[in-house]
């Protein structure tokens, strides 16, 4: 019931802000010459992997490579910050940006300066707000409720700022998250209970973020679906079986080998594919 009340509260706030946004003027047509893809986010947007750190093999890089094939004038502006939360995206404190105090401020400044030349904006944010709620091996529901409230409030402000700065010219896209804590299934009955509970939390987070993204006109990359997050169908695994969602987490992330939540190169390719399904390479 507590989570439901949070969702209702967020809904009222979102609709109120959306009414304000409808008064924004439409961005001018993209001029000839250089165009831009602006990518915001946390470590996923930086292609982080535990053995190499930030990389050029993440989903952002793979999306850009695909778009660049048909749009050689397109340049990538990669603003993501490993460890970023919705709060630090707004206020700063982790990564530095020349002339800007936060990732959001840097994005807003770039969008304003290059209004009409930005073709794509993607974002992933929120996982670092809520992942600590399972740090002890159990899910702290009070932490979850507080984190969801923070995410809802901050994401609203982030999206208001991005749309006000970028206008209606770019294609905007956000993503749902996969659930790395499904890997706990391999630890036995207690881990399996944690895994099932974590899916409920992931669904609540994804539902909240998807609702806010759609209110502000963002396309949704269904990463949760691509990782089969809700599919507990048993499939072969080693000498036995596990649910498909568990096998997928083991195959596409480092959770079952290095106990690290980040995707491997294959996992980043799956995330990129989810974005590519909703982001068009056609000219605006």
Model-derived features: where do they sit?
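Secretory targeting and sorting signals
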Residues: 2-29
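A structural preference for short, hydrophobic beta-strand core positions in alpha/beta folds
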Residues: 13, 17, 78, 174, ...
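Serine-esterase "nucleophile elbow" of acetyl-processing enzymes
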Residues: 28-84
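Acidic/histidine-rich helix-loop elements
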Residues: 48-57, 83-99, 139-142, 146
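Substrate-binding cleft and catalytic face of glycoside hydrolase catalytic domains
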Residues: 77-87, 123-129
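Alpha-helical cap/lid subdomain in secreted, periplasmic
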Residues: 98-261, 265, 269, 276
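Short, low-complexity, Pro/Ser/Thr/Gly-rich segments in the mature regions of secreted, periplasmic
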Residues: 274-284
